[in-house]
Amino acid sequence: YTLSLHDALPISPAAASPKPFDLTSTAFLIVAFLTGIAGALQTPTLSLFLTNEVHARPAMVGFFFTGSAIIGIFVSQFLAGRSDRKGDRKSLIVFCCLLGVFACLLFAWNRNYFILLFVGVFLSSFGSTANPQMFALAREHADRTGREAVMFSSILRAQVSLAWVIGPPLAYALAMGFGFTVMYLSAAVAFVVCGAMVWFFLPSMRKEPKVATGTLEAPRRNRRDALLLFIICTLMWGTNSLYIINMPLFIIDELHLPEKLAGIMMGTAAGLEIPTMLIAGYYAKRFGKRFLMRVAAVAGLLFYVGMLTVHTPALLLALQLLNAIYIGILAGIGMLYFQDLMPGQAGSATTLYTNTTRVGWIIAGSLAGIVAEIWNYHTVFWIALVMCVLTLSCLTRIKDV
């Protein structure tokens, strides 16, 4: 990705001639990849881990995702408000990586549902906040060095997707081949390397301490549209979370297909998301962000219709193209849409966007657990389909920026 980075980013003539290799941008790319890998080694197998290792019922599995999302929101709100007001994001990211390591160690050796939920998830929440903080730091770095923020951000997102191409199949291979302990220890290693990279290579962006206001600032302009966008992104991420919680168990328990297929499906979708994100970032100016979000929602609708109707490995893998368009555009454009609706509030906009994923997890956790407990895993995809329809109706009302 270093090549494409330099094609996309304008470099001042002075900086261009003596050093063609830009260490800071490369470090950002590697850190984005590592924070992605740390997450991608844990999330895809979590519902399976809770079912098989912790022996939790479907409702308890769903509740675990909900609980972890709620704890995550409190942690990230606290950190976001703090980092936008006072200083250095860099030391904060290192701290988050350190707690991420402790979380992985706990999951590696503990099998008590409640300890994992309250202690493990609290630590993981700090770990997962390393990612949005890294994006906020990247945005500040881009603004300060006069870079094209949209493209730089899209390329960083693509790194996270790349991590999700490798992560899920690797997670299933490690968990099925060597056990969950080895899988969680691998994630811990990713956090260690990531923390070290941040500490040694990322820039410190000192801020002048501002007068403290609320933790997360409300949008100063476009309030109605920011709220609508929050609902849209929450619904879209919610369907995706339903899919991540539900799909592995659906594939294994109801379709009786091999376990590794679940990992391959997630990896395939993530691989196809990379070109989708970059293309979306490229065309955002020409077509507008609202149009692209509508394209995404239609793709999502078709994807869940497919999940309800096709049950062979080849077709399930083919469907991932629609899933990639759906999530690739959402991941690439959603955050930038928030930043455009909330000018001058990059940290709050980014966190608001990140919280749509968490609220999506809250809704998905409760729905997936209850629906699977009462009916079956197949029914969960009907819920996702309804959420896609709601998304499309909200997208008719939002303004373009």
Predicted regions, residues:
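Short, small-residue-biased leader/transition segments that mark boundaries at the very start
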Residues: 1-9
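C-terminal transmembrane helical hairpin of 12-TM major facilitator-type secondary transporters
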Residues: 290-334
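Hydrophobic core of transmembrane alpha-helices in multi-pass small-molecule transporters
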Residues: 33, 114-131, 234, 315-329
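A late C-terminal transmembrane helix in Major Facilitator Superfamily
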Residues: 344-374
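Structural signature of the two symmetry-related core transmembrane helices
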Residues: 91-105, 188, 291-306, 385
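Intracellular juxtamembrane helix-capping segments at the cytosolic ends
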Residues: 128-143, 329-342
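Helix-to-loop junctions at the C-terminal end of transmembrane segments
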Residues: 74-88, 175, 276-288, 372
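Helix-loop boundary and gating motifs at the non-cytosolic
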Residues: 17-69, 240-254, 262
